Amino acid sequence: MRGGMGNMQKMMKQMQKMQKDMQKAQEELAEKVLEGTAGGGMVTVKVNGQKEVIDVIIKEEVVDPEDVEMLQDLVLAATNDALKKVDEVTNETMGKFTKGMNMPGLF
């Protein structure tokens, strides 16, 4: 019976280590800055790992008072591009912790 208890303690230590490693990875992700672009780099949106927009850069030559809708579309596309990159990096980083576990939609 003693062997079963030792295995349980070992498993608990592994779980605690994994939890600590996951927390560290999440903190590192939060500090990452990813960029999305649109219009051949005319609009750039920077987003942190928590999906907060931290900067929007619009090149002057794309600003046309006669075509505000195009600029809106470019900002939207660049933002979605940046958010997609955050999702990709998050899945890549956190996926190593959930590999082999059946936990759909966790990250």
UniProtKB/Swiss-Prot annotation:
A Pfam family recorded for this sequence: YbaB_DNA_bd
Ranges of biased composition (kind: Basic and acidic residues): 18-27
Region Disordered: start-end pairs: 1-27
Keyword Protein biosynthesis: no
Compositional bias annotation for Low complexity: 8-17
Matching HAMAP family: DNA_YbaB_EbfC
Protein name: Nucleoid-associated protein BLi00029/BL02358
Organism: Bacillus licheniformis (strain ATCC 14580 / DSM 13 / JCM 2505 / CCUG 7422 / NBRC 12200 / NCIMB 9375 / NCTC 10341 / NRRL NRS-1264 / Gibson 46)
